[in-house]
């Protein structure tokens, strides 16, 4: 099962650390994949959920590509990743599901059970995760032993 730290969170939401590069690296070093929010502004890529906060570059992304689930936050980011297909990326807003570039089913919170999907924040809706292939959570550590 894929265990994905939502914006780098492991044991609960720490909003001021979300999407911070070192926070992401900490989650990866603990063995988790990480969902990150990224946008393109001009020629630059930035991590950050609501605003561009942390500038990153191609090399930063490529060094972590096997552990990242990249949520494109604007069309420009989606176009950039579409030209750099080696990454696992997706776009969604309030869709029930979306397909990531690697073919995974990314399911909106509260929409489970969906066979072979990634459950997003299942703890919020007490989702049935028995058919999921992965979980993305702010509390991902609690799923490690389940």
Residue spans of the language-model regions?
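Phosphate-group recognition and catalysis centered on beta-loop-alpha active-site segments
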Residues: 1-146
């Amino acid at each position: 099962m894929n265990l994905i730290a939502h914006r780098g969170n492991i044991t609960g939401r720490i909003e001021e650390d979300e999407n911070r590069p070192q926070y992401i690296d900490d989650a990866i070093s603990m063995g988790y994949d990480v969902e990150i929010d990224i946008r393109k502004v001009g020629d630059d890529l930035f991590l950050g959920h609501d605003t561009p906060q942390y500038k990153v570059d191609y090399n930063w992304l490529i060094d972590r590509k096997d552990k990242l689930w990249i949520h494109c936050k604007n069309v420009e980011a989606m176009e950039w990743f579409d030209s750099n297909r080696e990454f696992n990326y997706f776009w969604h807003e309030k869709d029930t599901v979306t397909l990531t570039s690697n073919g995974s089913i990314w399911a909106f919170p509260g929409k489970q059970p969906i066979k072979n999907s990634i459950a997003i924040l299942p703890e919020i809706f007490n989702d049935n995760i028995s058919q999921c292939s992965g979980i993305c959570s702010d509390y991902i550590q609690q799923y490690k032993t389940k």
